Amino acid sequence: MNDWHEFNAAIKSIYCNAEGDSSSIINRLVGLAMKSEDSTFIEAVLVLKENVSKVDKQLRFLWLTSTINSRFYPPIPISEASPVSWNKTEYCAPGTEELQRRYPGRAKLQNEEDYSGGIEQCRDVPDCSLVASLINLRSKNLNLPLIKQISSTKYHVNLSFNGSNKRLVTVDISQIPTSVDGKQLSLKSNDISDKIGELALLLVSKGTYSTDGSNISIDTYRLSGFLPEITQVNSYPFEKLWKFHKSNLCLMGAGTGNRSNDMIKPLVENHDYSIIDITYDSRLVKLRDPRNSALNVEISYEQYLKNFKQLYLNWNQEKLFKRSQVLHFRYDTSRYNKFSIVADKPLFHLVNNSKVTETVWLLLESHLQDEGSQENRSVSFLNEAPECIICPIEPPVECGGNHIGLQLVKLRLDAETERLLYCYSTTNNNFSIHSFSVVKEICFQRLKDTKSLFAKVLFSFPYEIEGKASFDTCNFFQNPTFELEVHSEQDYQVLMDAACISTSSHDLINIQVYYFNDYELIKPIMFDNHYQPGQGLKQDVPILTNVKYMIVCSTYGPPASTEFELLASIRLSSSWRLISGITLRSVNLIYGTYPYHCRNRFHWKETSDKLKIQMTLPTKKYSTNKLFIRVVPVESSARLRMRCNIFEPESALCVYECQEYRTCPSGGIVIPDLEVSRTNIVVLMIERSVPISSCLPTEGQLDELELFVGSSQKIRIEKYSDDVIPK
């Protein structure tokens, strides 16, 4: 068997290592095969040599997620598995001191060929759902799970978990806890394969006989791969249930849950039962209690509705569908759960390319993790993305599997339509999504290229802003500002959504959208004066592709968080496939787009309504300098009105003229892209329309303003005459 042990080590190394040349490993196995007289070993080496070049990321992912509680369960069909074990221990421990005391011995699993009853649960093993699952499988003459004996005491079993229906589990039947009178911790059955199936699933689930319990849908899926559906007992009318049962397309069970004491006898609470028959004329549901093979309970459909909480269905996907595929991925909460919105989650694209409506089923499977992990406390689900994908996530209305790690989603897609779906989990875990369809025209894939759907940027608020910077203040223009442009080959009008999100719900957030050249922030598109806790959301904003826009994010008070995210997305109904990309980037437009910046504060004299500021330009002859000038009062006031003019002091020639007084907008008064040439000094004259003495007491000091100048070349701001007192 040494050759087989080396074969196992080699195949694990090849499939689990992304890098490295495997040729030396293969050559060594080929050398062993040439010396071997075991035809099975020789064939296994040849198959491995042929398939080693076909190893892709998805298959490697399956191998890398094979370890649970220090045991390795590779994705290998039993027909291709080596006849040796992958793990040192392959039997279950009792689990509790009480079970250890009552079952002190260890003996080989008893083969009860003379037992005449049906499959029956051992009262000391709380696995009624597992036994009920085996009862259902045998009632339909299904020899599942697949089992192969490899020695006198060891068996290979293929179970369905962690993304594969061919997980190889080896069980050792020589170490079964046994009482002094010969009773064993094992179900009763005249077929030892039922006992082996139970042992294999107990080994994988917890490794002991002291289980936490499960349900029929989960255990039937693990044993057979049949698709689990968990729903309320009243989800389907009686006629539907009868059709399901007669179709032989599914296995059925029901759970009482934590019911009240008025439950009819002999039903008990927190117990699963197999549904073994449904009579149409009498509307009777026949149940089998896994604890007693002689006890079949017949109840009316009305009693079924009253006494049971959940209906369990497991669908035979091989009878329902012709095509299937599976995607595997890792969910990292530090990456996907920082902000609770759809766009930040793993996205999946489902397309029906056929000419008719098609049915597609998706199964979201959470991978089993080590004992003590957060798996049992996890919530995970797959859901259709809303039109606005930057909205907060919402669990599906009907999601029976979001707490148990197996969620079945049934969809009907119209001809030549598509759906966008997202996955959410409260904990770190590996996931697999299985898709099933009848026709090959169904395409399901991970949406990794999201540039035509949304763009996002992380940012923090600058600390240099003094005081409030909400849109009703003169500091509003200093908030984080972003350039947005949606690109397409042709020009379209599309609906855009934008969201600014904080990691703190204490932040009150607002976002405004402007045309990019609206430096004074005069005309917001669809102005919204609300500040929302934790997330500012702006929806259905009509914009044109290939046109630049500006987004300004603000908080009502000092930000509580240092981490914010801005997202802009196109509505799914806005032909987002015609979009070639979305650009969203941080920009500083306080000084326009120029590289040189000057900033200073100035006071008006109490006796004057004019303020003159001298700007000294480079003395280089014939040079042209471009200026971006922003004039902002330090205190906001609706009563303060100003006008700005620029002239050459020597010639008194007006370089920029404004005759009307204006109320100062949110972005201040801006003179953009002013070209100055053939002179090295210009004077900015700022005039106000009311004297300071007439301001209201609540308005504070209106005698101070701030000047921001961007320029293509260096300039210097200094006082002109005696009107200016730099501060």
From Swiss-Prot:
The gene is RIM13. InterPro entries: PalB/RIM13_Calpain-like, Papain-like_cys_pep_sf, Peptidase_C2_calpain_cat. Residues 70-317 form the Calpain catalytic domain. It comes from the Eukaryota. Keywords: Hydrolase, Protease, Thiol protease. SUPFAM superfamilies: Cysteine proteinases. Its EC number is 3.4.22.-. Interacts with SNF7, which may act together with RIM20 as a scaffold to recruit RIM13 to its substrate RIM101. The keyword Protease applies. This is Calpain-like protease 1. One of its GO terms (biological process) is proteolysis.
